[in-house]
């Protein structure tokens, strides 16, 4: 594992800390290591939730390492499994990822956060996609995911001028889930992670699968699709041990014990 990446397991929760002074910028080597970490998370049956954050209090990540670019690393370089930052192109990850944004999330750093399922950010966090000012485009998900969250006028201004969005504005638009003080950031992310652990893993996997498959469909078409039997997790949930355990635990006034089957 890269020296720039620190992994901590807390039971079913994996914390990934990107730590590359001064701005947690990501070069190809670091991206490969992040991809390996996220794929291992995906495939480890004991892990349920991942939290990705940046080292320090100023930068979550400044995105692509422009020093590496100046030394010849191309924008279309091989950034390894999962695409840039290891997460932006993993499309079969059925476990939730929380981005704990501790500071500036610029360019690929913002794209990394957008690839997560939840964003918890510190009050000093801000978000931007300044690639057009550098002669490139935010093609690691920014230009694809941001239009699903914001009105076209706001998206156009952010991607074409690189304007920054504050944490509070991001909260108002629904881009982030929570804004907390810097000192409360990781506690808040861990609290959310534990809430996710308390939910049935098969149900969460099915929800992510349904979102991916039906997000562009009309509601009626989506109903037909999820009931057609083509999905992997949704049919399994309906006849799972967890589907019996949930109501039984509720009736017995106890916490459910999920088996993931």
UniProtKB/Swiss-Prot annotation:
Q: List its EC numbers.
A: 4.2.1.149
Q: PROSITE patterns attached here?
A: ENOYL_COA_HYDRATASE
**Where, by residue number, is the active site?**
111 (nucleophile), 131 (proton acceptor)
Q: Does the keyword Lyase apply?
A: yes
Gene3D superfamilies assigned: 2-enoyl-CoA Hydratase, Chain A, domain 1 (3.90.226.10), Lyase 2-enoyl-coa Hydratase, Chain A, domain 2 (1.10.12.10)
Q: In which pathway does it act?
A: Amine and polyamine metabolism; carnitine metabolism
One GO MF term attached to the UniProt entry: L-carnitine CoA-transferase activity
Sorted alphabetically, the keyword list is: Lyase
InterPro entries per UniProt: Carnitinyl_CoA_dehydratase (IPR022852), ClpP/crotonase-like_dom_sf (IPR029045), Enoyl-CoA_hyd/isom_CS (IPR018376), Enoyl-CoA_hydra/iso (IPR001753), Enoyl-CoA_hydra_C (IPR014748)
Single GO biological process annotation from the record: fatty acid beta-oxidation
Catalysed reaction equations from the record: (R)-carnitinyl-CoA = crotonobetainyl-CoA + H2O
User: What top-level branch of life does the organism fall under?
Assistant: Bacteria
Q: What does this protein do?
A: Catalyzes the reversible dehydration of L-carnitinyl-CoA to crotonobetainyl-CoA.
Q: Which family does it belong to?
A: Belongs to the enoyl-CoA hydratase/isomerase family.
**PANTHER family of this UniProt entry?**
ENOYL-COA HYDRATASE, MITOCHONDRIAL (PTHR11941:SF54), ENOYL-COA HYDRATASE-RELATED (PTHR11941)
Under which name does UniProt file this protein? Carnitinyl-CoA dehydratase
């Amino acid at each position: 594992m890269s020296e720039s990446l620190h992994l901590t397991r807390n039971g079913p929760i994996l914390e990934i800390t990107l730590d590359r002074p001064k701005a947690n910028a990501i070069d190809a080597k670091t991206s490969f290591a992040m991809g390996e970490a996220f794929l291992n998370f995906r495939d480890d049956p004991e892990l349920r939730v991942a939290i990705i954050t940046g080292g320090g209090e100023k930068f979550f990540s400044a995105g692509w390492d422009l020093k590496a670019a100046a030394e010849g690393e191309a924008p279309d370089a091989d950034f390894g499994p999962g695409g840039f930052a290891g997460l932006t192109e993993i499309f079969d990850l059925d476990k939730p990822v929380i981005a704990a944004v501790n500071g500036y999330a610029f360019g690929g750093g913002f794209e990394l956060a957008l690839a997560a399922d939840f964003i918890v950010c510190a009050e000093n966090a801000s978000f931007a996609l300044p690639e057009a000012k550098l002669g490139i485009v935010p093609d690691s998900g920014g230009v694809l995911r941001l239009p699903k969250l914001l009105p076209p006028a706001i998206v156009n201004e952010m991607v074409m001028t690189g304007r920054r969005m504050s944490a509070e504005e991001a909260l108002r638009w629904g881009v982030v889930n929570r804004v907390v003080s810097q000192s409360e950031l990781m506690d808040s992310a861990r609290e959310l992670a534990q809430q996710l652990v308390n939910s049935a893993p098969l149900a969460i996997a099915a929800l992510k699968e349904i979102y991916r498959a039906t997000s562009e469909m009309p509601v009626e078409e989506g109903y037909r699709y999820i009931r057609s039997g083509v999905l992997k997790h949704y049919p399994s949930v309906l006849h799972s041990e967890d589907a019996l355990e949930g109501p039984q635990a509720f009736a017995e006034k106890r916490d459910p014990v999920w088996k993931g089957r």
